[in-house]
Amino acid sequence: MKLIIKNLILLLVSCLYFLSNVSCDQEVHMALLLEGQVDDLGINYEVNQGLAETEALIQRAAKVINDANSYDSTYDNIKSLLDQDNPYNLIITSSESQMSAALDIASDYEDTYFLIFGDMGDKKVPHSKVGTYYFNLVSPHFVLGFIAGGMGKSVGMVVPGPPTENYFTANAFYAGMKYYTSPAGAPNPSLSVVATSSYDDYDTATGAGRILLTKDIDICTQSQTDMTVANMFLNASKWAFGTNGFPQSNIYGNRIIQSVVHNFQVPFYEAATMVMKNTWKNGYNFFGDFNNNFFYLDYYSFLVDPLLKNQTEDLISTIKGGAKPYITNGLTYEKILEQTKLSTGITDLGYYAVPTTEVYTTGSINKTFMAVSILEMAICLIIGIIVIFFFSRNINIIYSTIPYCLTILLGASLIAVAIFLWNLRDLNTQICTSKIWMASLGYNVLIGFIIIKSSLIYFKFKEMVKSKNEKISPIPFGRIVLWFVPLLIIDCVLLIIYSTSGNPGKIDSLGLDGIGRYEYTQNCVNNLTGDIILYIILVFHGLQLLYGCVIAWKTRVIDLEEFIEAHDFATAIYLITFCSFIIVILMVGVTSTSNRNTIISACAIFSSFSCVLIIFGAKFWKIYKPVEDDGLPQIKLKPQKSYSGSGGSGNSSGSKSKKTSAHSSTSGVKSGTSAPTQTSQSAMASINIQNFVNPIEASSRAAAQNDN
């Protein structure tokens, strides 16, 4: 019995010991985001290959998402991976373009592990479960440059160039060429570099490759993500290096002298293992290089001498041992990455860009608007001359005042100038800024002076009705200006902010409005602040129109001939408001910049030109053809009792007749009317109602009768 108990205790202790040494692995659900397609035989292929090897090692399936090449697509894809019933707990990115989105969403998911690709620099990870990985950007090109130096060939290299990528790849390659000690009598290798401002643009890479092929260059290399330039050299029976992480000899054979292969399985497996074993290192950072087997060389081409192979392997061993032969002249690795100039000895072939052609398909439309705007300015000038020199003493002009008439013409002319600038072909910053100023100030003057005078007329009319005062006098121009100054200040402040903070300017827009990729049109642009200020300016003018419609509705009851222009003002305001609604409706469905400019120009010309014709056309028509008797009957008033003081119809008529006579003398016309005198109760007074309500027309008829 004791033996049985002893054996049971021993068995229990053994089980406890065994269980205590068994690790409780955590389930791993990996997901990888690629910037491009998995089958590109480049960086995306190698990243996916590293994930596939990691899957085999940990025996866990993973998910791969292609084309996560923007902030929004990266953020949305990661969020969908984490908001599932069985969420992924290890998210891996593969491009620096995905870094910002991954860091942002990682701050909201502190229980999820992230392995983010890229150089963090001064950025901080949001929590301890966020790790990073990157690789040496210099050592691979240094090693390939060493091989090129040993071959003694002329090499051409295509790089993005600053500001897309500094010249550290070209300088590292050239440093490797010089690091090789050529034997006596061996040819000196050379390096020529062309920049394209892009990692993967096919057209610019092709153009850069053509430049290198015309320079009697034997071998090409590059720091781009595809093999466009290499293919051009291989098709021309020349040779190339593989630099995008894929073992290019698998495709092109011995025509690829050597490739530096990226082994992404190393960081992926290390991160997945830490998640499984729950041994994640805070601040985990992997920096790939030859010393941790992230980089390794592909098969050598038969073109490489065996001695050079051995020398290259010795160089790799030196780097694995911790040496950094690519660091010269006391520069640190970080300083090498900051090099914006090519090293002395490199032939700089400059930047290549695909030639662009300007497209100008709206020439006839623009010329038409420019001609109409010039015509509008000319008509405004002619009207101003006529008002000043021919009708300055006409009562229709006197009640408007000459300065007011000229100010209305000035506002319309400023709008015409804006439309002229809007349709110029050759643009610059000054033109782009000036057209906004002219349009805003023009409408501010035109609308502002109309609504202010309409308001003053309405207030004066209400005061006359309230006080029963029949004395009528023109609205002083100075009073209108005083009311307009605040509107002008607001407009100028907004325009100054737009000019200083909105950064308006001209840009050559490639491929805009359906034209070719390398065709461009000149357009005016501004930044986000400029857009906001423009919207505020539009709201400002919209409020002016809204108030104008209200005051126009109120002035409909004014029947005094001296203030009849208030009805013309109302028509002008309604017209501008209608055009504004038309612009909004048309602009909603229009995406073409040229079509938008056409709509703006047409509505601006129509509204401003029509306002001038409405306001001054009515005035000139009354001057040219005074209103005749409208056929109203001569009403004989019955005898009324005479009251003390001024009263009764006779006095009222007499007062009105005196005022009419004064108006006639002011306009240079001698009045032939006289006020009837009040007699006894039996006297009969006969008046013409038209003389009472329309004194200007009465004086005009009197002048016509005298002429006869």
Swiss-Prot record:
Cellular component terms per the entry's GO annotation: plasma membrane
Give the record's keywords alphabetically: G-protein coupled receptor, Glycoprotein, Membrane, Receptor, Signal, Transducer, Transmembrane, Transmembrane helix
Residues carrying a glycan: 21, 235, 310, 366, 527
Query: Its membrane topology, per UniProt?
Result: Multi-pass membrane protein
Single GO BP term: positive regulation of actin filament polymerization
Q: One MF term from GO for this chain?
A: protein kinase regulator activity
Q: Which domain of life is it from?
A: Eukaryota
- Where would you say this protein principally sits, based on its record? membrane
Copy out the induction comment: Down-regulated by Pseudomonas aeruginosa, PAO1 strain infection and up-regulated by Pseudomonas aeruginosa, PA14 strain infection.
Q: Where does the secretion signal sit in this chain?
A: 1-24
Instruction: Indicate the transmembrane segments per the record.
Output: 371-391, 402-422, 436-456, 480-500, 532-552, 569-589, 598-618
User: Where is it localised?
Assistant: Membrane
Q: Ranges of Polar residues compositional bias?
A: 669-681
Family label: In the N-terminal section; belongs to the BMP lipoprotein family. In the C-terminal section; belongs to the G-protein coupled receptor 3 family. GABA-B receptor subfamily.
Which protein are we looking at? Metabotropic glutamate receptor-like protein L
